[in-house]
């Protein structure tokens, strides 16, 4: 079953979004990092204090862009050296200011909770988790 996007990166007004989420994986992370429009969206979101979230291998992109300098962060095991300037925690999910990083797919619920906590509120995130009957 094909998935159809309702909007493409060419049609996004970055002033209208709360931030960006980089899903990671391989070769997904390499494809994201090779796309200049994705990198522009990440940099713009960071500069404007919007949410910048990355999971699995994708935090490496933030490291390469210098976004993690002085920030606590985590990533999929084996990508730690790519988190340039970061204080690597090794925990499942880390929120440092507007930056959220997570280790991998097994941390997706926690990662989503962190995103909703910043985008809406911790109470809203807790309600979503409660309604899903997890964590």
Where is each model-derived feature located?
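Charged, often glycine-rich, active-site loop that binds/positions anionic groups
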Residues: 1-3
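Active-site-adjacent pocket-lining segments in enzyme domains
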Residues: 5-135
């Amino acid at each position: 079953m094909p998935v159809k996007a309702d909007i493409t990166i060419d049609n996004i007004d970055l002033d209208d979004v709360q931030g960006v989420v980089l899903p990671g994986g391989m070769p997904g992370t390499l494809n994201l990092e090779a796309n200049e429009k994705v990198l522009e969206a990440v940099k713009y979101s960071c500069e404007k204090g919007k949410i910048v979230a990355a999971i699995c291998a994708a935090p490496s992109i933030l490291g390469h862009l210098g976004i993690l300098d002085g920030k606590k962060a985590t990533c999929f095991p084996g990508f730690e050296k790519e988190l340039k300037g970061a204080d690597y925690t090794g925990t499942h999910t880390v929120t440092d200011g507007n930056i959220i990083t997570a280790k991998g797919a097994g941390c997706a619920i926690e990662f989503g909770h962190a995103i909703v906590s910043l985008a809406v509120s911790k109470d809203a995130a807790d309600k979503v988790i409660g309604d899903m009957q997890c964590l």
